[in-house]
Amino acid sequence: MMEGFGVHTFRLVNGKGDARFVKFHWKPLLGLHSVVWDEAQKISGKDPDFHRRDLWEAIEHGAYPEWEFGLQVVEEKDEHKFGFDLLDPTKLIPEELVPVKRVGKMTLNRNPDSFFAETEQVAFHPGHLVSGIDFSNDPLLQGRLFSYTDTQLIRLGGPNFHEIPINRPIAPVHNNQRDGHMRQAINDRRTSYQPNSLSGGCPMQAKADLGGFVSYAEKLGGAKVRQRSQSFFDHFSQAALFWHSQSEPEQTHIVKAFRFELGKLEVPAIRERMIGMLTRVDLTLAKRVAQGLGLNMPDKTPILFNLSVPADGNAAQYQPEPNKREPGRSPALSMATTLKDGIKTRKVAILAGDGVNDADLVGMQKALREAGAEAKIVAPRLGMLTSAKGAQVYIDFSFLTSSSVLFDAVYIPGGDGSAQTLEKEADAVEFVKEAYKHCKTIAATGAGDRFLRTTCLERDGSDRENDRNTEDEGLIIGHDGDARAVASKFINAMAQHRHWARELKAQPA
């Protein structure tokens, strides 16, 4: 799942008119997880609707996604105590400095009946506020208050976009607005102006004590100029904070992402310039990226990083501020610290063929279901397969209609016939190898043990000298009849999401 958070700083205003700055957060109750880059690319080809389908199926099965609503509240007197501009939308407040206070919950408990009416026509707008919330002087937010209205005028056909059923407020609205394209409301009063006597003076402007909106009375002073605050030129301190807050695997993924993106540039000078910019974030990061691009570290960084300067501006005044502070760490910025206490909504691929061991299959399905996960049978063909005891088992996917990138973990049950079928199936071998490459949890019991070992460990299964090490790396191996014990270890390993230690080892091709 993903976190949600706004980039802008708003204000909370209480009944006495006292204001505090606030940043809003949505915290997923199942923790923060993601796919890796190679998976993301392959998912786009295998199932472009993967994430939407996953959300839909979870809701349909009653596993409702939940987020808790959190606030980071800052007193007005503390606006300048953080070393960065609180109104700069490119900055975040480390949760270690201002903890997120959770005050509510959102549950997605129903799928749309009509995607067009209920999702395509949604009009989000930062100016649609409830009582007690006001705007800050964030200049980007001020611009968006205009631009979002302008966008919906074109996107949804006119000024009455807020009257479309999905956008209509729950609280009743009374005003003097009439007509306009796509008008939904029908007004039965004679007047459309205020003051009036014909309609008893209604509707009339609501005062603050009646719930009307009143802008926060803030004292301001200064010259009216067209320029950014100097505090907005701190471009690197939080980039450094983010880099130093990541775990080793996350840092490696960031380096690879830079190597990929910059490797697509066809002008070497731009690559070199970007390496120079990364030195302002962290020298180690810059060196690792440069190594992957076949570049040497620059002898000196450019004097002028920012060349986007107004015609009458002084270029020196538009350069990023040097990062003079120690970057520090914020564990809240790393996915390595996320919640890892369950496997609800995870999808597990059970690879099987005719002759699959009944006890292994049924036992694992039961354990996964009780833990809140969903198990799917993947086989060389669709239809039904016959278990070792003659039971008919429905096949959810074939290897042609599925892929390991669409699952969170893989299980290979016992059964000599089933294991032999998988060993002869090139797509089955590729399925397991790819899951291993992406550091997913993989388990096997009985005859499935041999298939797992030869596929992932390049061993024939005759020795078990390193079983403990494989468990630490998310490979759970058991004997015939071990399904219950393996299931417990399998579920605990799945809760860790990925096993990044594998990335440090050479993997079979």
Task: Please give the residue ranges for each predicted region.
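Residues that flank catalytic or metal-binding motifs in active/ligand-binding sites
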Residues: 6-8, 22, 65, 102, ...
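Short helix/loop capping segments that flank catalytic or ligand/cofactor-binding pockets
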Residues: 20-23, 32-35, 79-80, 114-118, ...
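Hydrophobic cores of alpha-helical transmembrane segments in multi-pass integral membrane proteins
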Residues: 8-10, 104, 351
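Generic beta-strand/beta-sheet core signal
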Residues: 22, 70-74, 109, 351-353, ...
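ADP-ribose/adenylate-binding Rossmann-like module
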Residues: 438-445
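Internal mixed beta-strand/loop scaffold within catalytic domains of large alpha/beta enzymes
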Residues: 1-41, 49-50
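Extended, subdomain-level signal for the structured scaffold at the beginning of enzyme domains
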Residues: 252, 256-272, 277-437, 450-509
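Charged, compositionally biased interaction regions
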Residues: 49, 53, 57-334, 340
